Amino acid sequence: MNFFIKSCFLDKEKTDCIVVSVFELSELSDSAIYLDKCSNGHITSLIKLGDIQGKIGDTLMLYKVPKILSKRILLVGCGKKDEINIIRFKKILKNTIHAIKKKSIKNIVYSFSNINIDNIYWMIRRMVLSLKESLYETIKINNTNIKNTNIHSITLNIIKKNDLFIAKTALKHALAIDHAITSTKNLSNLPPNICNPLYLSYKAQELSKKYENNIVVEIIDIKKMKELGMNAYIAVGNGSKNKPFMSVIKYSGNNIVNKKIIAFVGKGLTFDSGGISIKPALHMHEMKYDMCGAAAVYGTLIMAAELQLPLTVIGILSGCENMVGSHSFRPGDVLTTMSGQTVEILNTDAEGRLVLCDSLTYLERFSPDIVIDVATLTGACVTALGESVSGLFSNNEELSNQLLHASQETDDKIWSLPLFSEYHKELNSDIADFSNIGRGKAGAITAACFLSKFTKKYNWAHLDIAGTAWKSGKKSGATGRPVELLCQFLLNQSNYIYN
């Protein structure tokens, strides 16, 4: 499906459907008024019949409107003009797709005027991403994938010609971000017998082939891990026949404007049984999503390469599988991490932090200025923040504020939680430097405190996405979060200006 930006006369557009907005009390938008005048009041006369009130959720399809070349006009209710926000705007766009996608409509022109939720850049970007999200379908493995829509192209009409350049920039960014989000979802949704640590390494290597001028990939296998002393990482994978692989993706942009080295680390547990501290059976199938952090890093690197961002970005996919076996690590074991610090294992289901701690230490060789790890780390974060908000932890206030700003811009909600010294005491151990879990309270915080012990040499932030990375139930699947937030963070680091 293709997107286009242009400024056009709506009555002259030969298309299958034009979409325009209508507000409560049957108030027409400027685009709807234009079409109404061109059709000698035809739209107004139909609205007076009472078939659309202009409330959010209302839609009315008009056919063969006089003096209009489009085959159809879709009127979309937008509620009260002064009460439209980002959430309502997304719902409005979803309603348009619901009204269109099952019909034989191939080409659409959107002309949304009088909706002032943001400047033209954000308006266009939100439209494209929301429409793309509404049309996304999880790839099935049963060879019966059916095309869910007939839509071939969507044109966004820009009322003011002076806005065309900014609108085209917004479209370019939106399509790159959507590519990142879709790639993240598709990877996350794969079953664990397909997507294992080796498969993650293959996906990383594909990037070096597709973006060969900007991306170099190094794969750290178990032999190399042993040489590096990554004993915590190795221990987690010992119970599985699928050996761990850590994929290191190095992106170097052209004409770099920001000399900082930015690194992302993604937890890539392609399946987490919990190990000997085994998980309950009921929802264990969802533990294929325990690699959503790695998938998010993978997607974010795609966006950087697509837009040729003038940055240096490193992405680590920490691929591993936590299974029960005769070689599994045990509660009571003491592991020496790559950093030299020792960890007493009290629970083998607190494994993500063990994979991440060695990955974070490995990153030191690149002397990064900023490191952000992304992980479906703790159920405690879901208990604290629910399924709408991700947890944020950081050892640097400026970095934390930058991520919070990107969160506000993208409406991908995160909330900052503390790393006070009192919480570190929860990890005390009698026989090691510290244990891998606390005593049951503030689990999301103590997990972040654990990670912070391996991040002393750079500015670091941790995003716990355990509640936001996927949805359960009837429409289950990966959400693609927090990819847009991470992409926006990189765009901001690139000094892009939005007018």
UniProtKB/Swiss-Prot annotation:
Gene that produces this protein: pepA
Top-rank taxon, per record: Bacteria
NCBIfam families reported for this sequence: PRK00913.1-4
Positions that bind Mn(2+) 1: 272, 349, 351
Upper taxonomic lineage: Bacteria, Pseudomonadati, Pseudomonadota, Gammaproteobacteria, Enterobacterales
Family: Belongs to the peptidase M17 family.
Annotated compartments: Cytoplasm
Needed cofactors: Mn(2+)
Binding residues annotated for Mn(2+) 2, in chain numbering: 267, 272, 290, 351
GO biological process: proteolysis
Single GO term (MF): manganese ion binding
A GO cellular-component term linked to this record: cytoplasm
Enzyme class: hydrolase
HAMAP family: Cytosol_peptidase_M17 (MF_00181)
Cofactor note as given: Binds 2 manganese ions per subunit.
Keywords: Aminopeptidase, Cytoplasm, Hydrolase, Manganese, Metal-binding, Protease
Active site: 279, 353
Catalyzed reactions per annotation: Release of an N-terminal amino acid, Xaa-|-Yaa-, in which Xaa is preferably Leu, but may be other amino acids including Pro although not Arg or Lys, and Yaa may be Pro. Amino acid amides and methyl esters are also readily hydrolyzed, but rates on arylamides are exceedingly low; Release of an N-terminal amino acid, preferentially leucine, but not glutamic or aspartic acids
Name of the molecule in the record: Probable cytosol aminopeptidase
Functional description taken from the UniProt entry: Presumably involved in the processing and regular turnover of intracellular proteins. Catalyzes the removal of unsubstituted N-terminal amino acids from various peptides.
Pfam families, alphabetized: Peptidase_M17, Peptidase_M17_N
Enzyme Commission no: 3.4.11.1, 3.4.11.10
Keyword Phosphoprotein recorded: no
